[in-house]
Regions:
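Conserved SAM/SAH cofactor-binding pocket of Class I
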Residues: 133, 137-224
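S-adenosylmethionine
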Residues: 153-156, 194-302
Length: 303
């Protein structure tokens, strides 16, 4: 049976109130999207930001009556005419999303592939990953940069005969970076995130890729004397600057630090924040985003 949807454009301050009202009126899902393609780059700590102009779509499986619409308009505080009602096809939305999510290549060997697809490459290192609860499927430039770094590092280690005993994925999201590091040869990984959904997704994804036994998840930030050969943090520039002493302390001598989630114009500030411990340099940029990388010297001074 076709479903119905209410679409409404509103400002940031109204969004949470309207979302709750739609659920109370029987909505099975509510999606908030940006009306004007405005980026949200640096919310304050603990703040959840929406766009200045937000489009809300609430989906209903039961027919929307005139009475329901009138009551909803009263609760929201708008004229009923602002509530745009439309019919949408009765689809399995997860399958629709998966249909658009195709295998992606990162560097020479690393691929992310949805569970319904395969990669025709005998040398491929494949991560099976479907869109889910947590951020990080490789579609965002910052995630792509980190994955390409991991692929390049694995190729370098293969040529030099080096190994990677311990990787830390700081702010793991879906766990894709930790899983990629393990699939590319790291012996053990620690995946940290404060979001319980992220840790659940990380565990599920690690199990699906056969690396759960080599992965430790943590909802408390790793502390020294844990010493990583490689630490990746794909978060925002503000937290990256604040965390500089902690992240630097988690690196063993000659350990590598990879930072992403920042724009090119934010790189200088982040590089300066880490300068007491190591020298970060731009590794690669993509669509205005930059990935920084550096190695901590044996003495813990800038290298």
């Amino acid at each position: 049976m076709p479903q119905q949807a209410i679409t409404l454009e509103l400002d940031e301050l109204d969004a949470e109130h309207v979302e709750q009202a739609c659920f109370e009126a029987g909505a099975v899902s509510v999606v908030l999207t940006d009306c004007r393609d405005d980026a949200i780059l640096e919310p304050a700590p603990g703040e959840v930001r929406l766009w200045p102009a937000t489009r809300l779509q609430a989906v209903y499986t039961e027919p929307l009556t005139a009475e329901t619409l009138a009551q909803l308009a009263i609760v929201i505080g708008c004229a009923p005419s602002r509530l745009q009602v439309s019919e949408i096809a009765d689809r399995v939305w997860e399958r629709e999303w998966l249909r658009d999510f195709q295998p992606m290549r990162f560097g020479e060997r690393l691929w992310i592939c949805p569970s319904h697809a395969s990669v025709d490459d005998a040398n491929a290192v494949v991560i099976k990953l479907d869109p889910g609860l947590a951020f990080g499927t490789g579609t965002h430039p910052t995630t792509r940069l980190c994955l390409e770094y991991l692929d390049a590092r694995a190729a370098r280690d293969s040529h030099s005969g080096s190994d990677t005993p311990l990787v830390i994925d700081y702010g793991c999201g879906s766990g894709v970076l930790a899983i990629a590091a393990l699939r590319l040869g790291a012996a053990h990984a620690v995946a940290y995130d404060i979001d319980p959904q992220a840790l659940t997704a990380t565990l599920d994804n690690a199990a699906a890729n056969g690396v759960a036994q080599a992965l430790t998840i943590a909802n408390e930030a790793p502390q020294a004397p844990l010493a990583a050969d490689l630490l990746l943090a794909n978060i925002l520039s503000g937290p990256l600057c604040e965390l500089a002493p902690r992240l630097a302390a988690l690196l063993k001598p000659d350990g590598e630090l990879v930072l992403a989630g920042l724009l090119e114009e934010q790189a200088a500030e982040v590089i300066a924040a880490y300068s007491p411990w190591l020298t970060l340099r731009p590794w690669r940029s993509l669509e205005g985003w930059v990935c920084l990388a550096g190695t901590r010297s044996a003495a813990g001074e800038p290298a």
